[in-house]
């Protein structure tokens, strides 16, 4: 005779945790830092956005693909323009206070430092590519983009300085 089948029982223990639980939120509503745009770093970010937009639109409105060097200038200008808009939104909405795990002063220093270095190289490439094209109908747009690229470089240099000061004060504490 066959033995009757016994009912098996298992104990299952589950634990649930959410990655979002690790983030401390101070409030559920969005904050807006109205004073940020009145600070020098805030004004520099706005200048970077406006001048960076001028750099890449002045080049994009021409036949820039005929001069390969402008591809580098376009990449740097558009890449850092998008990231700068992203950082402006983070600073205005005070998102950095909701995500304390991110070392924002270090991120800001690396971002502004890399933007300064790459924009400087792009501005030099832009200026050196304009000169041989003096007879081109695109000359004025390219010359203006070169001028604005150097202005954006100065803005990123200023923000790199302020980021360094903020980073240094955080590491000393």
From Swiss-Prot:
Keywords: Chemotaxis, Cytokine, Membrane, Transmembrane, Transmembrane helix
Keyword field contains Transmembrane: yes
Principal location: membrane
MARVEL domain span: 36-168
Any GO MF annotation of the entry: cytokine activity
Keyword Nuclease: no
TM regions (residue ranges): 40-60, 70-90, 105-125, 147-167
GO BP terms, alphabetized: chemotaxis; myelination
InterPro entries (alphabetical): MAL (IPR013295), Marvel (IPR008253), MARVEL-CKLF_proteins (IPR050578)
Compartment annotation: Membrane
Pfam families named among the record's database cross-references: MARVEL
Record membrane topology: Multi-pass membrane protein
Sequence similarity: Belongs to the chemokine-like factor family.
Record-given protein name: CKLF-like MARVEL transmembrane domain-containing protein 8
Native species: Bos taurus
């Amino acid at each position: 005779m066959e033995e009757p089948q016994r009912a098996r029982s298992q104990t299952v223990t589950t634990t649930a945790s959410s990655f979002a639980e690790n983030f401390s939120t101070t409030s559920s509503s969005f904050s807006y830092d109205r004073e940020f745009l009145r600070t020098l770093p805030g004004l520099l970010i706005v200048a970077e956005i406006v001048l960076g937009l001028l750099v890449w639109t002045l080049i994009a409105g021409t036949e820039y693909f005929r001069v390969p060097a402008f591809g580098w200038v376009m990449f740097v200008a558009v890449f850092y323009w998008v990231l700068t808009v992203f950082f402006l939104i983070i600073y205005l909405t005070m998102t950095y206070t909701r995500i304390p795990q991110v070392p924002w002063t270090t991120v800001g220093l690396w971002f502004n430092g890399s933007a300064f270095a790459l924009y400087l190289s792009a501005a030099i490439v832009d200026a050196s590519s304009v000169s041989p094209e003096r007879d081109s109908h695109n000359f004025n747009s390219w010359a203006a983009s070169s001028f604005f690229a150097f202005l954006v470089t100065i803005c990123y240099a200023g923000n790199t300085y302020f980021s360094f000061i903020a980073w240094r004060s955080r590491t000393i504490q």
